[in-house]
Amino acid sequence: HCFYNAVMNTNYIEELNESQCAAVTYNDGPSLVIAGAGSGKTRVLTYKIAYLLENGYQPWNILALTFTNKAAREMKERIARQVGMERARYLWMGTFHSVFSRILRAEAKYIGFTSQFTIYDSADSKSLIRSIIKEMGLDEKTYKPGMVQARISSAKNHLVSPTGYAANKEAYEGDMAAKVPAVREIYTRYWERCRQAGAMDFDDLLVYTYILFRDFPEVLARYREQFRYVLVDEYQDTNYAQHSIVLQLTKENQRVCVVGDDAQSIYSFRGADIDNILYFTKVYPNTKVFKLEQNYRSTQTIVCAANSLIEKNERQIRKEVFSEKERGEPIGVFQAYSDVEEGDIVANKIAELRREHSYGYADFAILYRTNAQSRVFEETLRKKNIPYRIYGGLSFYQRKEIKDIIAYLCVLNNNYDEVRFGRIVNEPVRGIGSATLDELNRVVSGMGISYVQAMCESDSLPSLSRKAKVLVPLGETFSELSQHTDDISDGSLIDDILDRFGYREAMQRQGLEGEVRLENINELKSNMITFAKENEGAGLSE
């Protein structure tokens, strides 16, 4: 099937090896591409999409699902180089969560939301769970918010609703064994509170997409018609919910290509289900399997070592990865008796290699599994005067000032957002304590009005009237700025937040630290302007 395509000038024979070429050009049904490490998996996906575009598919009829925004961005850039940006920009390509949130915003009315729904990140979700635990009078030492959040997340990843959870014998026994029988009630309240706040957490983006397609066949039919070919990257990392949605979209026309490697499945603790890739051929009986076994990244020594470990896996799709590179250096294995000794071994090895090969410090990388492990390495490196830089620390979007401004934007977009409102109602400090916030929550819940309306009407509400002097002007400012959420093109909304809510002034009082925080907020503003340029007509909800 490998050929030279004169129309788009792609020479598949020259640019791909035989296995890659076969996987790219097969288009007669479902395909499973088992891609060993360093075997050109991204290359296959990008060429496959280019091949589809060259052979009659329109870009808006192709859906490509990835696990990171970075992977989606890189793929789109590569495809644009092959078929031109004009065609590449219309592809539906992104993470499961970004693509499904786009679908849910378009179809929100079917599932009882507005298109302005808020998306809660993990910290927001945990904060709401903590409030519910407190309201129920439960002991936070027993009902740790992180543990409860993990149980709720696991239920959602298996498409188990609060009602289903309450009726699930396995969940009940698990909760009883862990002495946390109230998890089912927390889950029910959490689900209701998210709906009341017009909010979804990351897991909900999957759950509600599944519900949308399950309960509204006409909507599913529309998206099946639109997505004539579906590609999924890193299939070994999909969970039950993701797999189920892919099945909903592709069961009928069978035009689906999934790429992955069962030997690289490491996310079971986050709900990934290796059975999705192992039993793919049972779910899609007409599947053609392609194996990419040539590793272009590593030496033969490294590849052999990996093969010898993987062959011990009891359940696997057999493959024999090989490399045509030289054998390379043997792999060193050191056993340390403590974390301190481990730090010493690594630091001494760096010093030794620098003496022998005149390497620079930037030629070395230390990889570790958990953030807590960095402490010992840092202490050892400092002791030996070895300069270092830690990557992947606190992310930009986790900084306090960034989360504050995003919370303001979220409340302007969705006046019912309980978690974000709770974060910024007294930020900067304006004398609104937890008692007033609790009362606002009761009013919003009891009267079915928004937080902004509750503040604006607080002078006529007995339980809030004593705080009306602060609440009414605050509510009016929110109300006014909420009218300007359609146009984010110049980022002026962020300036309005800084100036009208006193945030800039509060930062300026913090001296140098405040200046750095304002610079970070400026960076957020630049990101917003760039996003608006790249997504014409986008409003705040996007």
Name each model feature, range by range:
Residues 2-119, 197, 220-221, 275, ...:
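P-loop NTPase Walker
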Residues 9-15, 41, 47, 51, ...:
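Conserved RecA-like helicase ATPase core segment
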Residues 14-33, 44, 63-64, 71-74, ...:
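Conserved helicase NTPase motor core
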Residues 17, 65, 93, 118-122, ...:
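Conserved phosphate/pyrophosphate-binding and hydrolysis machinery centered on Walker-type P-loop NTPases
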Residues 27, 88-90, 109-204, 227, ...:
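ATP-hydrolysis module of ASCE/P-loop NTPase motor domains
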Residues 33, 37-45, 108, 285-288, ...:
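Helicase P-loop NTPase motor core
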Residues 99-107, 263-270, 297-298, 390-413, ...:
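Short alpha-helix plus adjacent loop in nuclease-associated cores
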Residues 176, 374-386, 399, 406-542:
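Conserved helicase C-terminal RecA-like lobe
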